[in-house]
Regions:
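N-terminal [4Fe-4S]-dependent radical SAM core
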Residues: 1-111
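Conserved AdoMet/S-adenosylmethionine-binding subsite of the radical SAM
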Residues: 92-219
Length: 219
C-alpha cells in the first residue's frame, strides 16, 4: 500500500492511497491480492491500546466505503496480535489517510501508478477522496502520476468542473478491452490507453481513432 517499487514496466512505483473496487471484473488481480492479505476467517480486528479504536471509519455519504488512519491490526481467536493489514474491509473501497504524505517523503523523482489496487474514479468514490489524492500529488511535483480507470466519464465530469489537474506530470489513462469502449481524451491533458486484457482486435480507426488521439497506448 505504501510508495513501493514495482516490476510493472511502464512505471517505477505504485502508491495506493485508495484501494478497493466495485466493478466486479472476473479477471481482477487486485481483488485476489486484497482477499489474500485481508482478514482471514480466524482473525479479528485488534483495538489500539491507548485509544481503544480499531481505526476504521465509515463514509456516511458513500455507503460501503471506508477510511482508515493506519494499517489495521489483526488478532487471532485468543486476542494475540498476528499481523497488520492495509485491506481490513477486503476489497471494499478504502481510503488510507496515513499514506497521503508518501509522495512528499520520497524526494527522488518517480513514475507512479496511483491506485493500482482499485479504481480512484469509480462512481462510488467520494469527490473528496479524489481531491485529497490530487492535493497530495500537487505537493510533490517531482513525480509523474499515472491514473487509470474503467470509468472515463468521471474524468470528464471533473474536467468540466475544473477539478482535473493539468500538467505534464498528470497522466489520465483508460482501461479498455475492446474497440467499442469509451475512453478519455481532452485537449491539454496527457492521456493514454491500457488495452488489458486484449479481448478484441483493434485497428487504427477503432473507437473513433482512439489509438491516434491519445498520447500513449499500453498493450
Amino acid at each position: 500500500m505504501n510508495f513501493r517499487r514495482t516490476k510493472i514496466d511502464w512505471c517505477t512505483h505504485t502508491w495506493n492511497p485508495v484501494a478497493g473496487c466495485l466493478h466486479g471484473c472476473d479477471y481482477c488481480y487486485a481483488r485476489r491480492i486484497a482477499q489474500r492479505f485481508g482478514p482471514h476467517a480466524t482473525e479479528r480486528f485488534m483495538a489500539d491500546k491507548d485509544s481503544g479504536a480499531v481505526g476504521i471509519l465509515t463514509e456516511p455519504e458513500a455507503p460501503g466505503c471506508y477510511t482508515i488512519s493506519h494499517a489495521v491490526k489483526l488478532a487471532d481467536n485468543t486476542g494475540k496480535y498476528t499481523r497488520s493489514t492495509p485491506y481490513p474491509m477486503g476489497f471494499a473501497p478504502t481510503l488510507s489517510a496515513h499514506l497521503m504524505s508518501n509522495p512528499e517523503k520520497n524526494i527522488t523523482p518517480a513514475r507512479v501508478f496511483v491506485c493500482n489496487m482499485g479504481d480512484l474514479f469509480g462512481e462510488w468514490v467520494p469527490d473528496k477522496w479524489i481531491e485529497t489524492v490530487f492535493d497530495a500529488c500537487s505537493r510533490a511535483p517531482q513525480h509523474v502520476y499515472m491514473f487509470l480507470t474503467k470509468n472515463p466519464a468521471r474524468y470528464l465530469k471533473l474536467a468540466q468542473a475544473g477539478k482535473l489537474p493539468r500538467g505534464d506530470n498528470f497522466w489520465y489513462g483508460t482501461t479498455i478491452t475492446a474497440p467499442d469502449q469509451e475512453y478519455f481524451y481532452a485537449e491539454g491533458y496527457k492521456t493514454y490507453l491500457s488495452i488489458e486484457p486484449l479481448l478484441s482486435a483493434f485497428s487504427e480507426n477503432d473507437t473513433g481513432g482512439a489509438l491516434e488521439m491519445v498520447d500513449w497506448v499500453i498493450v
